[in-house]
Amino acid sequence: MVAPLSSFFTSATIVRGIKEHLGLSTRSCKRQAAIGRDAADIGMPQRSGLHATNERNDGVMNKTPTIQNGLGTLIITGSSGLIGSAFLDRVGESYTEMGFDRKGPPHPPPKTEHVIACDLSSDESVYAALDEVRRLGHRRIASILHLAAYYSFASESSPLYEQVTVRGTERLLLGLRDFEVEQFIFASTMLVHAPCEPGERIDEDWPLGPKWDYPKSKVTAEQLILRERGDVPVVLMRIGGVYDDRCHSIPLTQQIKRIYEKRFIGRIFSGDITHGVTFVHMEDMVEALVLAVEHRKELPHVTTLLIGESETLSYDELQRAISRQLHGKEWTTYQIPKPLAKLGCWLQSLLPGADPFLKPWMIDLSDDHYEFDISRARTLLGWEPRHTLRKSLPTIINGLKSDPAGWYQENKLRTKTIPDQ
């Protein structure tokens, strides 16, 4: 009986970094993740680790020329995911891309010539993948785009956050020590920050305050990267909720679905309806990655960036905009007490055909508000989002109205709940 959807969007994929993308191993280590302060802010000392290339401008390496000569080698983890696929579409054949991912079903192969099987939860698999990069003659890496991570709304916590997101990052960093690496980009999330109040704007120095295992694992991974990076420049991208013209945002999809099906649950909310979260369109997200790679030589050695739209729609504004597009009229959203919402959510889960997305633990997050100050990304990258969720909603909704079954299937919704037209 609650719709706390807009309270904790990510990069999905980053935003859909679920374990089927990663080929998880049962041999994963299960050490406890520790959440500490932001190492970027406290000047954590560097240890001997990855080696930055010393030949950034001489063009000596003929086998893997630098990007300045027209090609450069990129390693993209999670390359068959939504963000990875969109990035590969964007860069085309400009670079030599090494896609680290699971080969075969259930996902189509990444759109790159070199697809290398890599299970981040396995030491052997990660090192074998890097050995294959070496065998292909690529010792000098222009940029590592580390997009793969574990992510799921199924539960508040999971050992896979530690095994994949944290220890998988550690395996990758250790394996890269034999390479010359010009840049390491880590896809993090806005949820590492404590929420703000409407009218305030979160910047990169805003206090940390992750509330569940997904953002907690990102904080731990960020700090691990800063400890183990050696002299390799790193970019920590803290990303808003990623969506595209077909939606592909789990919480946003669920919100649209409830209003489309005219469910009563779509009219109630356990949080402050004047609060909302930051989104970013996939094309703008990818552009930020491209610009970070292109500007890697001018960026500080440790760069934290918030990537999201400047405008944050409140939950109520989003409800009204969706209902106008779907039904030609605005819905009124009613706020209910959190204890009642948790009880209703639990009772609903016992019913046949219950909404599998809503969980009682989400209700405590429903008041969270995220609004970005993106001036650092503007200054360092020259990045400016060209899309807004407000202007993109008509395209998203029209896609649903023109082909409900296809839209449901593409967004992994149960088609049996589609209302009769």
Question: Can you say where each PLM-predicted feature lies in the sequence?
Answer:
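Amphipathic terminal alpha-helices
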Residues: 62-67, 372-380, 384-421
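NAD(P)H-binding glycine-rich loop region in Rossmannoid oxidoreductase-like domains
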Residues: 120-164
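Conserved Rossmann-fold NAD(P)-dependent oxidoreductase catalytic core, especially the SDR/UDP-sugar
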Residues: 171-213, 235
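Active-site Tyr-X1-5-Lys
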Residues: 211-235
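NAD(P)-dependent short-chain dehydrogenase/reductase
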Residues: 228-277, 282-284, 291, 322
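Conserved C-terminal active-site "lid" loop/helix of NAD(P)H-dependent oxidoreductases
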Residues: 282, 344-384
